[in-house]
Regions:
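Switch I (effector-binding) loop of TRAFAC-class P-loop GTPase G-domains
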Residues: 159-184
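Hydrophobic/aromatic ligand-binding patch that stacks against planar heteroaromatic rings
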Residues: 82, 110, 184
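N-terminal accessory targeting/assembly segments
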Residues: 1-73
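Canonical P-loop GTPase G-domain recognition
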Residues: 98-148
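Histidine-anchored nucleotide/phosphate-binding helix
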Residues: 74-84
Length: 184
């Protein structure tokens, strides 16, 4: 967990919370100390939540697509519908803009009225200013197909090498599921 000052805490869920799997990434919780351990005792009411990705209390989802692998626009459709239903902004981010392919204009035409913003980035080159402007001051979650550069974007935004990144498999032309965790 992360406390109100941004300090990382190691916490444990116990009892009903652990057994029933009621916790989501982004939940605000109450804690207590028990035998030298910090334990989650209560989940506070959520302002919003999604099942996929399994998150709570976010201001926006960044739906990341890229020219490679081929964009799954049905996935973008699902994210937009789920975000709208939950009252969460959805920013569509076209990463790897240096590779050509689908451009912001095409995506804007198709999704512009449903997305809170459509931005183009090239995380490997550090071209992320449009994304920074779209998410400034917001608690966001990145979602999208494997291999579109979600971890590379997070690394570029934080200035840290927090997340392992990989290449697109030439055999199957998809990402290799390098990142398999969720964290705030």
């Amino acid at each position: 967990g992360v406390d109100e000052n941004g300090k990382t805490l190691f916490v444990r869920a116990r009892g009903k919370l652990k057994r029933d799997g009621e916790l989501l990434v982004g939940d605000f919780v109450e804690l207590s100390d028990s035998d030298g351990e910090t334990v989650i005792t209560k989940v506070c009411p959520r302002s919003n939540s999604l099942i996929r990705p399994a998150v709570a209390n976010v201001d926006a989802i960044v739906a990341v697509i890229a020219p490679s692998p081929e964009p799954d626009l049905a996935l973008v459709d699902k994210m937009l519908v789920n975000c709208k239903r939950a009252g969460i902004d959805c920013v569509i981010c076209i990463n790897k803009s240096d590779l050509g392919g689908v451009g912001p204009g095409e995506i804007e035409k198709q999704y512009g009225s449903d997305a809170s913003a459509v931005v183009a980035t090239c995380a490997r080159r550090g071209e992320i200013s449009e994304l920074v402007a779209a998410i400034r001051g917001k608690l966001v979650c990145f979602a999208g197909q494997s291999g579109v550069g979600k971890s590379t974007l997070v690394n570029a935004l934080t200035g840290e090498d927090r997340h392992k990144t990989g290449e697109i498999s030439e055999k199957i032309m998809r990402g290799k599921n390098t990142t398999t965790s969720a964290r705030i």
